[in-house]
Amino acid sequence: MDFETLLSYEWGVMMPEFIILGVAVALSLIDLFMPENRNRQLLGLFAFVGIAVSFVSLLSLWTSDVTSILGDTFRLDSFAKSFKALLLIGSALVLLLSIHYEPKERIAYRGEFYYLFLTALLGAMMMASSGDLITLFVGLELLSISSYILVAIRKKHTLANEAALKYVITGSIATAITLFGMSYIFGFTGSTNIKEIAVQLASTSDENHQYVLSLAFLLTFVGLSFKLASAPFHMWAPDVYQGATTPVVSFLSVVSKTAGFVIVLRVIVSVFAQTPAGSSASMLMTFAPYIAFLSGATMIIGNTIALRQRNVKRMLAYSSVAHAGYVLVAFASLSMFMFEAIWFYLLAYVFMTIGAFAILQVVSQHPDDEDISIFAGLYRRSPLMAIAMTIFLLSLAGIPGTAGFIGKMNIFLGAFVVEPAHYVLASIMVITTIISYVYYFGIFVQMFFRPVEHTHRLEWPPGVIAVVVICVIGTVLLGVFPNIAYDFLAPFQHFSDFLQ
């Protein structure tokens, strides 16, 4: 590839990624030359500004046509734009939490947190725009390796070390399984380009090849299910959530999970949606019942085990497992509005989950003090924050008037509009949602109907207050006026360019 060819590419489509990369490199150099006793909070603010500028650059590309560069290894389509917006919004909110987290632990600011955070975000954004299995895998590893280190960033903390070890082991196994599945796809087609793979597989008719492709589908989907923390591949989540810091848990719960669904949609839908699997059904349609079974099991296991949890982080970990099941309902239904339903639900999930973790971060005065009883009497100590937490819990539970309700309703209706309708899956969704009321309202009871155990005044840093306010506004606004979000997607025409 000569210099003139490089100059001919439209590098502007990668501007959001270039900004994140540049800020991450700059932060690493600044941190290297800063005195050890200097406060690293400014690095966090610099990282936040970088994410904001990257988001603005993404908005400037919002109405641009589909563009691919570097041999179609990087493509900017409606799917990439919409999901990168989710990743940037979630990352910006988590970063505000992290800036005000470390002083509470009375440890020095560690600058590496911020550029590792940005590196993980960069990997997730690359996954959203990947048009090639190699680019997709590089993005996945950028996200995964950075996440492993972020979980273990408290090197002398026993629970953090245990969580990081479990995360590395399960994550490595998941990566190996995913790569094994992708190797079958490459071996069959001789290409790593997703578009070329889809074209070749669409013309496959030999029944002997169906077994190989079915194995590739199962291996790839099982490996990626670890990233989603869907049952039965969720066992790492509770321990990792309990051992990691609250900002890192927020990142894993929101940004990393969103990236997981991004790669599932990019690989599974792009490659297997048009691959024949006997009769007139595609391979994706053939495996839809298995995905539906996995979705139902994830909703049941996540919500029922959460009932037994006293540790709030472990409770929210199992809640996160259940929410992965809800999103998988949309994936199993394969309705024409699948992308919009998944995108809206993940947007609602960003606001209600990060908001809940923001309040937990302040209420939990000690890193290991995360029992549900820490919320006792919160309404008397901080009425506004108790009301805000109630809004987040209501949204997580799917109560009308909140963004969570609209997200669940869209997915629920999507399960009915397809042929054949997924009545059983929709019923499981309703029943498990009702079950979730028990453990969500357990926190509600602690806040409003239990006596105050701690009388000391809660300190609410400006960054945390900003996160809570933004999340409350987002949760309520999307619950009352959901068309605001859908109007945001109007230029994309139901993601019609996804398979082009």
UniProtKB/Swiss-Prot annotation:
Its EC number is 7.1.1.-. It is found in: Cell membrane. InterPro entries: NADH-Q_OxRdtase_suN/2 (IPR010096), ND/Mrp_TM (IPR001750). GO terms for biological process: ATP synthesis coupled electron transport. It is a multi-pass membrane protein. Its main location: membrane. One of its GO terms (molecular function) is NADH:ubiquinone reductase (non-electrogenic) activity. It holds the Pfam family Proton_antipo_M. The chain crosses the membrane at residues 13-33, 42-62, 79-99, 111-131, 133-153, 168-188, 211-231, 245-265, 281-301, 321-341, 342-362, 386-406, 424-444, 461-481. Keywords: Cell membrane, Membrane, NAD, Quinone, Translocase, Transmembrane, Transmembrane helix, Transport. It comes from the Bacteria. It catalyses: a quinone + NADH + 5 H(+)(in) = a quinol + NAD(+) + 4 H(+)(out). Belongs to the complex I subunit 2 family. NDH-1 shuttles electrons from NADH, via FMN and iron-sulfur (Fe-S) centers, to quinones in the respiratory chain. The immediate electron acceptor for the enzyme in this species is believed to be a menaquinone. Couples the redox reaction to proton translocation (for every two electrons transferred, four hydrogen ions are translocated across the cytoplasmic membrane), and thus conserves the redox energy in a proton gradient. NDH-1 is composed of 14 different subunits. Subunits NuoA, H, J, K, L, M, N constitute the membrane sector of the complex. This is NADH-quinone oxidoreductase subunit N.
